[in-house]
């Protein structure tokens, strides 16, 4: 019996959310959970819109001083269940650089291993309300070097931070797509709404540009162009 070959014409889209789970997130725990679940729904809807050209996966890394909890790890979006109250319980410190470094490095290694067989796109969104204060494995320069290397491969990085000072962290690690986060119920809802709209624009633009059908170098250029204008709407 002939084995059916995998369809390699679709782009595998890896959606990574790196979510702060430090103690200060307790006051907006419900809003953070609701926002993540809305994002999951938004990605699921995007896959339905672009089912002929895109195949979506999600990784959700919730981090605090206790470690990095990979709630989802390259999970097919149709298999991702809603984030629950028990799965997201804020506590302790903010090892931001470790969370970014470990999660992005793992995905970089994985995508390099499958690059010969499939086209991949990676979107990384970092959501934090505080400063780095507990990393043990990664520092700012190491994270910056990793992010710059991944951006050259067409990855998109965005950083959502509470306060102008927190957003300066993004600049130090080579992330230019930033959004200010007002830590209220309404502010948290607005942040996730805007993030999901930006993500939808990115997916729709990928589909319009027929990214999966382009030559490898052309695909990379398209992704880099889309990544640079992630939060810039219709500009």
Predicted regions, residues:
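Acidic, low-complexity intrinsically disordered regions
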Residues: 1-235
């Amino acid at each position: 019996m002939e084995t059916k070959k995998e369809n390699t014409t679709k782009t595998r889209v890896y959606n990574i959310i790196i979510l702060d789970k430090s103690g200060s997130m307790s006051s907006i725990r419900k809003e953070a959970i609701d926002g993540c679940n809305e994002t999951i729904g938004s990605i699921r809807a995007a896959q339905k819109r672009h089912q002929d050209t895109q195949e979506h996966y999600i990784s959700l890394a919730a981090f605090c001083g206790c470690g990095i909890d990979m709630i989802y790890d390259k999970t097919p979006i149709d298999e991702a269940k809603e984030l629950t109250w028990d799965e997201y319980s804020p506590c302790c410190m903010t090892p931001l650089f470790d969370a970014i470094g470990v999660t992005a490095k793992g995905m970089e290694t994985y995508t390099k291993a499958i690059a010969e067989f499939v086209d991949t796109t990676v979107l990384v969104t970092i959501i934090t309300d505080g400063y780095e204060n507990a990393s043990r494995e990664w520092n700012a320069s190491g994270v910056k070097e990793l992010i710059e290397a991944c951006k050259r491969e067409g990855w998109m990085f965005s950083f959502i931070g509470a306060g102008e000072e927190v957003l300066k962290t993004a600049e130090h690690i080579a992330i230019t797509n930033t959004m200010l986060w007002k830590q209220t119920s309404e502010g948290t809802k607005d942040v996730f709404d805007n993030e999901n709209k930006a993500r939808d624009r990115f997916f729709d633009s990928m589909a319009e540009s027929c990214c999966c059908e382009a030559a490898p170098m052309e695909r990379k250029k398209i992704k880099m162009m889309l990544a640079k204008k992630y939060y810039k709407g219709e500009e």
